[in-house]
């Protein structure tokens, strides 16, 4: 498995796939080696769980989730990341990526089709611009999840708390 927290590995993948970050999507990828294991731990990446991951980046958090959970289904809006994920996540048989917009995805149907007999949790490192809409959608929906674990920018957290 590639060390997706190593800046040289990331630079190599950026160059290999000609990938540039999209400001419109607010892309920011996790590279701190201590953060992803903690998010996975708090996000119920353990036996008996299916995890919905919102946004994958290059798969840094995805890999940590897939190490522990029975299944990880990632919803990734940027189709340019799919070939990168084929490379970085190829060793995980319990990982699946769906190229879709989380705000237009029927999560109840996804849970029924992908996580039969499993508890479900949601995990994400959310971009600033979509933090509030995604969190509100998850909280207001009727989806059967045990936990929602998201990492957000400090400013997004302050804005969200001010709205409540």
Regions found by a protein language model. Give the residues of each.
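Catalytic cores of RNA-modifying enzymes
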Residues: 1-164
């Amino acid at each position: 498995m590639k060390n997706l927290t190593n800046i040289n590995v990331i630079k190599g993948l950026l160059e290999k796939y000609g990938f540039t970050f999209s400001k419109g999507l607010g892309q920011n990828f996790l590279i701190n080696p201590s953060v992803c294991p903690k998010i996975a731990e708090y996000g119920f990446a353990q036996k008996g769980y299916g995890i919905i991951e919102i946004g994958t980046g290059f798969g840094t958090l995805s890999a940590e989730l897939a190490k522990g959970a029975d299944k990880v289904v990632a919803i990734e809006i940027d189709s340019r990341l799919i070939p990168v994920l084929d490379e970085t996540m190829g060793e995980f048989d319990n990982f699946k990526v769906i190229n879709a917009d989380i705000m237009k995805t029927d999560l109840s149907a996804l849970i029924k089709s992908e996580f039969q007999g499993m508890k479900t949790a949601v995990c994400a490192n959310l971009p600033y611009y979509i933090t509030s809409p995604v969190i509100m959608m998850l909280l207001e929906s009727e989806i059967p999840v045990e936990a929602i674990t998201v990492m957000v920018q400090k400013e997004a957290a302050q804005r969200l708390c001010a709205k409540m």
